[in-house]
Every structure is written in structure tokens, then in C-alpha cells.
């Protein structure tokens, strides 16, 4: 869990990590003080952290505002070694509840706290990845990744794009999703009225002498109508991904 609170003069970021060997019962998602429980499958879930020596505690309830969107299977490798082989789905919705850390309690109103939830399974390059066999060769080049689950008043958008170092698309998924006022109104695991998109495009504007992005234009084209959808972004603050665990020096 990572909490990033942005105010007018400061930004507080704190993370809670927990891990253990998976047990025999797949529905038991308890790791020490952490618990993830499914309230209604593919609609709502609850995260609970009981009091522990990290100073973290809290309870958050997620409720879907959209149905789920399945992302394409992601596979990457170096030589004969698989670095990533995952399946994932994403759902956009509301979060409500509270978190407490550093002796400060923060309340989250579900009516104004919009966010996302994704679940993935498989091999991921965390904690060094798969250590079996000979050491992996140094990685040549890199990977370009854009992921944007977006909330608007009357719809949500999902934009995901992986490219290689030459700008060639590896994986992509684009969709415009209807929104619903309650989880009871969700039409099912997936929504048959979702507008699927292709031809994902991006235009990034970088700060001078920096790799920091200042503004972005994302675009995609509706498959059935051919209509091009363009969304513009301006930078508000910087989010540090390593706090979650990606390429973290210790976690």
C-alpha cells in the first residue's frame, strides 16, 4: 500500500509492505496485519491493516464505478529467460475509509475519492525476478510504458501502451467505459457496451534538460466509428514509483 497525500505546501508519501509464502487456501489473502477480502466478486473489495509495529493501520473499501477491462497477456524475456509473464484486469471505482500513519488519521470520502484497482497473476520482475539458471545477460535498451486509467463525470477511459526502444508497439489496450452510480447497477464482470479503441498515440513534452514530463497528449481511435479521442494532461506533482516496489533498492 502506498499513500501519497498532496497539499498546498507539502507532499507526504509512506508505504506499507508485507509478504509471505502463499498458503494452500487461495481465498485467504492475509499476510500478517494485512488482509484483502472480496466483498462482492469483481465489484467490491476491502483492504484492512491492523495495528502493527510499522505505525500503519487502516481500512479501505473499493466499489467499482465501471465493470472490468481485461488487459492483454504481457510477456517479456531476455534470451531464454522469462522476465515477465502476467495476466491482469483493471477496474475503476471509488475508495472510502481511513488510513493512519505517523500518528495522523486520514479519512477518505467515497463520493470524492476516485481511483482504480488492478489484479495480476504470474511472473513479475520484482525482487530480482526468476533466479533459476545462469545469471541473466545485461538488459539491452529499455521499455516504454504508459498506463492511464482516467475518471470523468460521465465515462471512464483506459489507456495502456508498451513500446520497445524503437517505438514499436508490444502491447496495447484502449477503451471508453460507461460509469454506474452503484455496484448493483454494474452489468457484469465485463460491460458489453464498452467502446474498444486501437491506434494508441502519445505526445510527450519534457522539461528543459530533463527526463521529467511536463505535459502529455494521449489519443486513440474508436474501432467501430473511427472517431479519434484525444486527452491532454498537465503535470500536477511527481509520483515516485519505487516506493511501491518497482526497482526498489531494498524491497
Task: Name these PLM-found stretches.
Residues 1-7, 11-12:
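Single conserved hydrophobic/aromatic residue that forms the stacking wall/gate
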Residues 29-145, 152:
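Intrinsically disordered, low-complexity linker/loop segments enriched in Gly/Pro
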Amino acid at each position: 500500500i502506498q499513500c501519497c497525500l498532496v497539499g498546498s505546501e507539502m507532499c507526504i508519501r509512506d508505504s506499507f509492505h508485507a509478504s509471505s509464502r502463499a498458503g494452500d487456501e487461495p481465498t485467504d489473502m492475509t499476510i500478517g496485519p494485512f488482509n484483502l477480502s472480496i466483498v462482492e466478486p469483481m465489484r467490491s473489495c476491502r483492504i484492512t491493516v491492523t495495528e502493527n509495529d510499522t505505525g500503519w493501520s487502516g481500512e479501505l473499501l473499493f466499489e467499482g464505478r465501471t465493470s472490468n477491462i481485461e488487459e492483454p497477456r504481457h510477456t517479456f524475456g531476455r534470451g531464454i529467460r522469462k522476465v515477465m509473464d502476467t495476466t491482469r484486469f483493471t477496474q475503476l471505482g471509488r475508495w472510502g475509509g481511513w488510513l493512519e500513519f505517523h500518528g495522523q488519521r486520514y479519512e477518505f470520502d467515497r463520493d470524492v475519492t476516485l481511483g482504480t484497482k488492478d489484479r495480476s497473476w504470474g511472473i513479475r520482475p520484482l525482487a530480482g525476478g526468476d533466479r533459476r539458471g545462469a545469471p541473466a545477460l545485461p538488459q539491452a535498451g529499455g521499455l516504454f510504458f504508459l498506463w492511464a486509467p482516467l475518471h470523468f463525470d460521465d465515462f471512464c477511459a483506459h489507456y495502456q501502451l508498451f513500446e520497445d526502444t524503437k517505438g514499436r508497439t508490444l502491447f496495447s489496450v484502449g477503451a471508453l467505459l460507461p460509469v454506474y452510480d452503484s455496484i448493483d447497477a454494474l452489468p457484469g464482470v465485463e460491460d458489453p457496451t464498452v467502446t474498444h479503441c486501437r491506434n494508441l498515440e502519445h505526445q510527450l513534452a519534457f522539461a528543459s534538460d530533463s527526463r521529467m514530463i511536463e505535459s502529455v497528449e494521449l489519443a486513440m481511435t474508436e474501432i467501430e466509428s473511427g472517431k479519434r479521442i484525444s486527452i491532454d494532461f498537465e503535470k500536477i506533482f511527481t509520483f515516485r514509483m519505487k516506493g511501491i516496489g518497482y526497482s526498489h533498492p531494498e524491497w
